[in-house]
């Protein structure tokens, strides 16, 4: 729905496939665990990642975001196990981040919890994800500085108006669930991300 409104003037009507309308399958989950609860109950979620302290900032990398992504992956795996659901991480779960350095960092954090999954899961940039989909997509924006906002965008114009190709691809890779991570204050300086955050919070 968001992609249709933001990029196609509402002209792209969602089909509403059964797997997008049915209840999420996680009947059993730990309600005291915030990450597990988010995964078990939300189809679209924005997770605010606080800015790192100045001395902890690294170019094209975000340690805290990588750790939260690893916790999301852990929650997905645990929920499937708790609910007796089969799951193939390499085919059903995908992670999109904008930088190679962040790809390595995310993989390293996942490896601390699930070494086999860290080897198999596809963690890549939005450009390389074009044309493929997963049941669950985790999209980490990674950036910590205002000047990096432009890196996330690829604005073009078509008949329906201005389209951010990168954001459009990132948020339309998910069949069932989409988790977006980033620094809310920073991302809200971009009009489309501002609208996306509002959309996630309402749904």
Give the residues covered by each predicted segment.
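Helicase-core coupling region on the C-terminal RecA-like lobe
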Residues: 1-75, 132-134, 169-175, 179-203
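Conserved P-loop NTPase motor core of helicases/translocases
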Residues: 19-25, 111, 125-127
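Short, contiguous acidic/charged loop-to-helix segments that flank catalytic cores in large enzymes
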Residues: 56-64, 85, 126-129, 153-160
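Conserved helicase motor "Helicase C" RecA-like lobe of SF1/SF2 P-loop NTPases
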Residues: 75-125
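Conserved nucleotide-binding/hydrolysis micro-motifs of P-loop NTPases
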Residues: 100-103, 129-130, 143-146, 184-188
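A short acidic (Asp/Glu
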Residues: 101-108, 134-135, 190-192
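Short, glycine/acidic-rich beta->alpha junctions
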Residues: 118, 159-163
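A short beta-strand element within the Helicase C-terminal
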Residues: 124, 130-144, 148-154, 169, ...
